[in-house]
Swiss-Prot record:
GO cellular component, as recorded: extracellular region; Golgi apparatus; transport vesicle
Gene expressing this chain: SFTA2
Pfam families per the UniProt record, alphabetical: SFTA2
Glycosylated residue positions: 37
Signal peptide: 1-19
UniProt keyword annotation of Endoplasmic reticulum present: no
PANTHER family reported in the protein's UniProt record: SURFACTANT-ASSOCIATED PROTEIN 2 (PTHR38500:SF1)
Protein name (database record): Surfactant-associated protein 2
Subcellular location: Secreted; Cytoplasmic vesicle, Secretory vesicle; Golgi apparatus
Keywords: Cytoplasmic vesicle, Glycoprotein, Golgi apparatus, Secreted, Signal
Species of provenance: Bos taurus
């Protein structure tokens, strides 16, 4: 990818299923090399689920990875 834009992981914590409650967004910049080999296969969603566990995120937390031209999304189910 070279000098492409950095990957940014956005975590949105929603207080209710309708999104009407309080929320928080956390932005993390990740190295392209960390996800370069897994960004287009099914193990990438497993990576996001493990990220939920690592950060002890509450059930229903929306995790989205934004990259130039695409995004991946998972809802924490822990």
């Amino acid at each position: 990818m070279g000098a492409g834009l950095p990957l940014v992981l956005l975590l949105t914590l929603v207080g209710s299923s309708q999104g009407a409650g309080p929320g928080m967004t956390l932005q993390l910049k990740l190295k392209n090399s960390l996800l370069a080999n897994s960004s287009y296969n099914s193990s990438f969603l497993d990576f996001l689920q493990k990220f939920c566990l690592l950060l002890h995120l509450p059930l229903g937390t929306n995790v989205t990875l934004h990259q130039a031209g695409s995004s991946q999304h998972v809802t924490c189910r822990v």
